[in-house]
Amino acid sequence: MSFHHIPVLLNEVLEYLNPQPGEVYADGTLGGGGHSEAILQAMGETGTLYGIDRDPAAIAAATERLRVFPGFHAVHGNFHDIKELLPGVQLNGGLLDLGVSSYQLDTPERGFSYHEDAPLDMRMDTTQGMTAADYVNTVSEQEFCRVLREYGDEKWAARIAQILIEKRSEKPLETTKDLVAVVDAAIPKAVRRKDEGHPARRTFQAVRIAVNDELAPLEQALRDWVDMLVPGGRLAVITFHSVEDRIVKLTFRKLQNPCTCPPKAPICTCGKKPLGRAIGGAIKAGKEELDENNRAHSATLRVFEKGT
C-alpha cells in the first residue's frame, strides 16, 4: 500500500509559516510528506527541511516522494527528541501534525483501526516498545480507567476497565476485534446505537496515546522546538482531540507569560521574560476542506512565534 495521507489545514500552515527560499524547517511528523512537500516547494532549491518520523514506513515513503528536493533530509526518530536529533540546528519554522496518519489507520496489520480485525499493535515505531496487546493485558484496572478518562474522554471508562480485566482473565486480548468486544460488552446497546461515531473510537485513541507515550513529554517537546527557532521563527502544531489541544494551548500561554510572581505583586521580580506570542488563536478548517477531508473536522491549528 502506498503511504497516502491528505495533509490537513495545508493552506493555513503555509500562510502562518510563510516559508521562504534559503530557510531551514523541520517537520516533526513527516507522515506521507504532504506538508513537507508544500514547504519545500515554497522554499525552492535553496531551502532545507528535516523530516522526522517514528514510523520507518513513513520515512521510506516520504523519502521516495521527496527525493527530487535537494534540501530534504529524512530523520528516523521521535519529535520529542528534537535537540538530540538536530543538535545545533536553528529553525525558521517547525510543524507538528499530531496523531495517527491515514496510512496507519488504513493498514490493518498496524492495529490502529477498530473497523478491521488485526493484531493489536498500535506502535507508531514498529521497531521498539510494547504493543497495544502487551499494554491491555498488563495494565491495572485503576490505571486503565484513568487513561480512558484522561486520553479518551470516555464516560464509560470504569465499566470498560472492569470488563477488560474480566475478559483477559479468560483469554488474553490479541486482536483489535478483542478490544472492540470489550467496549461492546461494557457500553449498553441503546447507548451504542445513539453514538454518532464508533463506540470503540475513544478507547482506541486512549490506548494508542498510552502505548506511544504521546502526551507525557509533549509540553517539554514544545518548549524544545520553540527554543530551536530563530527570533521571529514560528512553530505550527495541529491537534485532533481536546487533550492534546489543551496541552498546546497552555504551553503556548506559559511561554508567552512565564512570570511566576504572585498575581498581586506590583512588579516582576522572577526575571522570566516572554519567549514570544501565540498568534491566530484556534484555527479550524474551512468549509471547502471539511467537505473534501473528513479528518479535518477535528483538527485545530495553533501557532507560536518566537520573540525577536
Regions found by a protein language model. Give the residues of each.
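S-adenosyl-L-methionine-dependent methyltransferase catalytic core, i.e., the SAM/SAH-binding region
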Residues: M1-T308
